Amino acid sequence: MSAVFADTSFYLALLRGDDPVHSRALAELRAGHSIITTEFILLELGNACARATDHADFLALVAGLRASPRATIVPLGSQLLDQGMQLMGERQDKDWSLTDCISFIVMKERGIHDALTTDKHFEQAGFTTLLKQGAD
């Protein structure tokens, strides 16, 4: 099975049972994909889980990712950060976040076409979003 990129919205959907794509996120998790994500995504997720009541679930999710043979977490690094900022500068016509730009670079470098995300910016960058809302 080919690798997919996991974005912040995928992890939030897994953690929040009331999320509109929670069921689809669970189904994708159970599908057995090899998952690629970045420490930038985990940083963004950690910020989204800032409420004390979310800490345990966030930490458990990260521990599970680190332990999973199906998951690869691309580390933070100055070169990747610089590449993301360069792409952001090149695409000032788009409302892409720095984390989005870094994700796109990782996906292109690894030949990944599919993203576990609800974020339309991935489609703007030429990728397929597997959790597109309203796709049921």
Predicted regions and their residues:
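Short loop->beta-strand "edge-of-pocket" segments that line small-molecule binding or catalytic clefts
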Residues: 34-36, 69-72
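Short, well-structured N-terminal submotif of metal-dependent ribonuclease cores
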Residues: 1-37, 50-63, 133-136
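Short secondary-structure boundary segments
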Residues: 39-41, 100, 119-120
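Short amphipathic alpha-helical interaction patches enriched in hydrophobic/aromatic residues
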Residues: 12, 49, 69-70, 88-92
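Acidic, PIN/NYN-like endoribonuclease modules and their adjacent C-terminal/linker elements
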Residues: 104-105, 109-136
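Active-site neighborhoods of divalent-metal-dependent phosphate/nucleic-acid chemistry enzymes
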Residues: 72-114
